[in-house]
């Protein structure tokens, strides 16, 4: 167990290299930013922004896609209940996605998440996208697997969006949103063919246009 704890600590520290580089440049409050839900056919796109306290270990923090739902939920609870962790969430609706396209909606969700931080960051580490912003920032490809703060943001955003999709399942039980979270699985596509799209489907996405 001790070896496992040491391994998890080292893994976390290996994901703070980008943060430490930015600290070395004189910045002091670094927020990681990531989005969840660009690809699904239904539901909003959600972004998370997270500021982790420097020097504090959060074992298990990793790319949300590499964690089981149980692991992800546990780490989310640890992050949200830690008084030294600051986080913000941004949500952009299906209607807005259809209006401005998913890329611009993703950027809008990220900007909202940053604005919803209770502490003002002086530097942003952003997963995969160049985000025009007044705060200095750095784009990191696959940042959710390389940066602890981006990984934390991805976990928070993923859990938040999954909760939203479970709520949508209560309103629209025919589609199985609680299982696939809006992604284009075979079961989801079959439901679309059987029932047609509902209000929370993205009408601008090709698979939805084909059944409208």
UniProtKB/Swiss-Prot annotation:
It is found in: Cytoplasm. Its cofactor is Mn(2+); Mg(2+). Keywords: Cytoplasm, Endonuclease, Hydrolase, Manganese, Metal-binding, Nuclease. A divalent metal cation binds at residues 34-35, 127. It catalyses: Endonucleolytic cleavage to 5'-phosphomonoester. InterPro entries: RNase_HII, RNase_HII/HIII, RNase_HII/HIII_dom, RNaseH-like_sf, RNaseH_sf. Its EC number is 3.1.26.4. Coiled coil: none annotated. One of its GO terms (cellular component) is cytoplasm. One of its GO terms (molecular function) is manganese ion binding. Manganese or magnesium. Binds 1 divalent metal ion per monomer in the absence of substrate. May bind a second metal ion after substrate binding. HAMAP family: RNase_HII_B. Endonuclease that specifically degrades the RNA of RNA-DNA hybrids. NCBIfam families: PRK00015.1-1, PRK00015.1-3. This is Ribonuclease HII. It comes from Chlamydia caviae (strain ATCC VR-813 / DSM 19441 / 03DC25 / GPIC).
């Amino acid at each position: 167990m001790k070896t496992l704890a040491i391994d998890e600590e080292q893994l976390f520290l290996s994901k703070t290299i980008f943060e430490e580089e930015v600290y070395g440049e004189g910045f002091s409050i670094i927020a990681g930013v990531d989005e969840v839900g660009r690809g699904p056919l239904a539901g909003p796109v959600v972004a998370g922004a997270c500021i982790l306290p420097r020097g504090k270990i959060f074992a298990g923090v990793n790319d949300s896609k590499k964690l089981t739902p149980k692991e992800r939920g546990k780490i989310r609870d640890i992050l949200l209940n830690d008084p030294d962790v600051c986080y913000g969430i941004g949500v952009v609706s299906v209607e807005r996605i259809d209006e401005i396209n998913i890329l611009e909606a993703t950027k809008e969700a990220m900007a909202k998440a940053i604005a919803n931080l209770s502490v003002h960051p002086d530097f942003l580490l952003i997963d995969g996208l160049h985000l025009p912003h007044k705060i200095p920032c750095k784009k990191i490809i696959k940042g959710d697997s390389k940066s602890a703060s981006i990984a934390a943001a991805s976990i928070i955003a993923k859990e938040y969006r999954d909760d939203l999709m479970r709520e949508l399942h209560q309103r629209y039980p025919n589609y199985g949103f609680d299982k696939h979270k809006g992604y284009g699985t075979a079961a989801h596509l079959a439901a679309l063919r059987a029932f047609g799209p509902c209000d929370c489907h993205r009408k601008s996405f090709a698979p939805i246009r084909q059944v409208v």
